[in-house]
């Protein structure tokens, strides 16, 4: 719903949350259905390669994934917040511990991965002593460390590049996505002088989402656009069109799976060169198809 047609800020936010617009006395749904993927049989795949990539949210082109706002003209969330909200409200159900999508995560496991509660020893001692502690006092003894959008600096994606025999074109299908952030428990690690001990650069995969299960949520979430606050580009559009910058860190082409850093250790420049080599190898698949 546009702010230009709104009677009040509260009504604007209310109808946005419902994915509806009010025209006269009628409410009209503006919910988007994601564009359906074409059905592809294994026999129609001539060549394929599965790749894992990292999207650095510090890069300018990737900022739309990071932007979190609750403005009137445009109300947007970061991709991480969208995924987390979808997981918590049950609209995204396919959530796993890693990119192999074997071990599902429970809501409690997801909460443990994104939130850490530290209880002061003094509180435990008072409880064990049988003292009654008010809610106000309790807050003084409890610290909650939570992974928020500003703490998620990178995303991981897993997808397949393939050539469809029916049209001989190189295509891409996104399979999974993960948010990377610090282990929230590391925020609570303090030295004798109160200095943080957690490694600021150490990021973990908070959770992996099987992408097809998240499409309906992402197809109804608008991406922040600083050139046009009324833009209707969705996260599903952005990801499927590959409008981002990324680095390949792992690939699988039928001969095995390998993390680049494992077979090219301790050499960042050589790892970047290998990532580019794999990108070129993907592009050459289509040329090889025509020369076959």
Residue ranges and their predicted role:
Residues 1-144:
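N-terminal Sec/ER secretory leader and immediately downstream segment
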Residues 56, 96-97, 106, 148, ...:
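Short, solvent-exposed coil/turn linker segments
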Residues 136-170, 182-223:
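Short helix-loop boundary/capping segments
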Residues 194-258:
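A recognition module on extended beta-rich or small alphabeta surfaces enriched in W/G with H and D/E
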Residues 231-292:
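A cross-kingdom marker for long, charged
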């Amino acid at each position: 719903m546009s702010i230009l047609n709104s009677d009040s800020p509260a009504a604007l936010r209310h109808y946005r949350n419902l994915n509806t617009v009010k025209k006269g006395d009628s409410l009209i749904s503006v919910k988007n259905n994601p564009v359906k993927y074409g059905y592809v049989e294994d026999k129609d795949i001539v060549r394929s390669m599965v790749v894992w990539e990292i999207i650095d949210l510090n890069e300018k082109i990737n900022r739309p994934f990071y932007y979190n706002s609750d403005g009137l003209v445009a109300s947007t969330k970061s991709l991480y917040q969208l995924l987390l909200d979808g997981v918590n409200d049950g609209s995204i159900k396919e959530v796993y511990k890693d990119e192999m999508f074997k071990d599902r995560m429970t809501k409690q496991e997801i909460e443990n991965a994104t939130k850490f509660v530290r209880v002061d020893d003094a509180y435990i001692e008072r409880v064990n002593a049988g003292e009654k502690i008010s809610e106000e006092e309790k807050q003084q003894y409890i610290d909650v460390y939570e992974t928020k959008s500003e703490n998620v600096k990178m995303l991981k994606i897993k997808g397949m590049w393939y050539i469809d025999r029916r049209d001989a074109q190189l295509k891409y299908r996104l399979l999974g996505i993960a948010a990377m952030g610090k282990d929230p428990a590391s925020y609570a690690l303090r030295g004798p002088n109160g200095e943080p001990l957690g490694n600021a650069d150490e990021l973990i995969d908070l959770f992996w989402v099987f992408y097809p299960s998240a499409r309906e949520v992402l197809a109804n979430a608008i991406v922040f656009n600083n050139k046009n606050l009324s833009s209707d580009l969705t996260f599903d559009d952005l990801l499927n069109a590959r409008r981002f910058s990324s680095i390949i860190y792992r690939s699988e082409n039928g001969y095995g799976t390998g993390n680049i850093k494992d077979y090219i250790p301790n050499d960042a420049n050589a790892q970047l060169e290998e990532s580019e080599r794999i990108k070129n190898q993907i592009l050459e698949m289509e040329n090889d198809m025509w020369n076959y």
